[in-house]
């Protein structure tokens, strides 16, 4: 589980992500282990309201995630599913409408697509957002496709070292860096 790796054999992101996981409290590990299951329950509710698939429900939840806290994200997904007006970024609403027909394919951004897949149960999906960039000391909060893939690979590598799914490792690092599960 805690294999000793020579520091020259890992990337900076792997090193920093590994340090986050090693500093995790039991409460943080518990939060991370259930976070996506709880998010999936929201997506299942949205899907049920709309009479559609989990893929579509998760994609709608993810569509409202950019620049939103989780509670607001959930409220907007429920409002959308219930046909109520949704305020906020117009692009998020466009993605949610497209998700009704296209599911995951409506989400062109790496982050929103991976988030929908993780919510829908893909344990290998890794979401790289501002907090994951900061945890890796990335030079930007908005990674290029290449940097996104590098950070995602680093999470997967560290997850494997600790016997975690990549999705759970990402949630754990996020909770530690962000300071809460919200």
Regions found by a protein language model. Give the residues of each.
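HhH-family (HhH-GPD) DNA N-glycosylase catalytic core used in base-excision repair
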Residues: 1-182
């Amino acid at each position: 589980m805690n294999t000793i790796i020579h520091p020259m054999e890992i990337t900076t992101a792997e090193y920093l992500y590994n340090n986050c996981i090693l500093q995790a409290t039991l409460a943080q590990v518990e939060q991370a282990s259930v976070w996506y299951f709880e998010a999936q329950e929201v997506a299942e509710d949205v899907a049920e309201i709309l009479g559609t698939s989990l893929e579509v429900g998760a994609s709608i939840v993810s569509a409202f995630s950019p620049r939103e806290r989780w509670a607001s994200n959930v409220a907007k997904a429920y409002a959308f599913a219930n046909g109520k007006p949704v305020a906020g970024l117009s692009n998020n609403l466009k993605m949610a409408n497209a998700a009704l027909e296209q599911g995951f394919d409506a989400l062109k951004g790496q982050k929103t697509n991976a988030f929908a897949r993780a919510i829908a149960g893909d344990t290998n999906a890794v979401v790289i957002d501002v907090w994951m960039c900061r945890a890796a000391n990335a030079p930007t909060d908005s990674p290029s496709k290449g940097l996104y893939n590098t950070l995602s690979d680093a999470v997967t590598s560290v997850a494997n070292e600790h016997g975690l799914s990549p999705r759970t490792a990402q949630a754990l690092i996020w909770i530690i860096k962000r300071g809460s599960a919200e």
